[in-house]
């Protein structure tokens, strides 16, 4: 028999290593004489901000639906992926989520607010032909070069299962290169 592997990896909590991971491999070996998946991504645990296991009984658990309602799903995801590598335990702190919302998403929002009025004034519609690189100002060539380097490096991080490094590279690009340099010098 031939087994169809739909995904090349499985991601589960570190507490599932002996149970779920092993069971899937044992079944696949017995039934299909093959492995169940090619790679394992073992997620760490989400702990409270002091490094303790979250528990309703202790009152230190965070309601995920309440957190999504309060902060939004994108800031929560971004905080969790850029705060620590997925295989490490994450000390969850709502102050960190607020900081991500302000520093990363606020910067993205403000960058767009800088761009939008000028684009609207010029009648920009995303349908225009590309401006040849040689006809662009030096600052535009610089940010596009930085963007292309970012894309290459983020792709390499993802290929190496390093989403935290990828997220931090994006963070640095948005906060440093795009906002602090490009937007400020273009004003």
Description of each model-found segment:
Residues 2, 7, 34-187:
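Long, charged, mostly alpha-helical binding arms that flank functional sites
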Residues 17-33:
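Metal-dependent nuclease catalytic cores in nucleic-acid-processing enzymes
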């Amino acid at each position: 028999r031939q087994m169809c592997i739909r995904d090349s990896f499985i991601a589960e909590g570190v507490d599932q290593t002996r149970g779920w991971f092993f069971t899937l491999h044992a079944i696949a070996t017995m039934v299909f004489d093959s492995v169940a998946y090619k790679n394992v991504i073992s997620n760490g645990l989400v702990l409270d901000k002091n490094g303790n296991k979250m528990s309703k009984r202790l009152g230190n658990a965070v309601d995920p639906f309440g957190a999504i309602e309060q902060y939004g799903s994108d800031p929560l995801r971004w905080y969790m992926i850029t705060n620590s590598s997925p295989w490490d335990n994450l000390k969850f702190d709502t102050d960190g989520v607020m900081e991500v919302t302000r520093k990363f998403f606020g910067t993205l929002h403000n960058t767009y607010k800088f761009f939008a009025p000028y684009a609207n004034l010029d009648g920009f519609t995303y349908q225009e032909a590309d401006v040849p690189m040689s006809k662009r100002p030096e600052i535009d060539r610089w940010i596009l070069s930085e963007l292309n380097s970012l894309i290459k490096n983020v792709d390499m991080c993802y290929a190496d299962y390093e989403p935290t490094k990828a997220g931090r590279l994006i963070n640095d690009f948005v906060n440093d290169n795009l906002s602090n340099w490009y937007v400020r010098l273009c004003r």
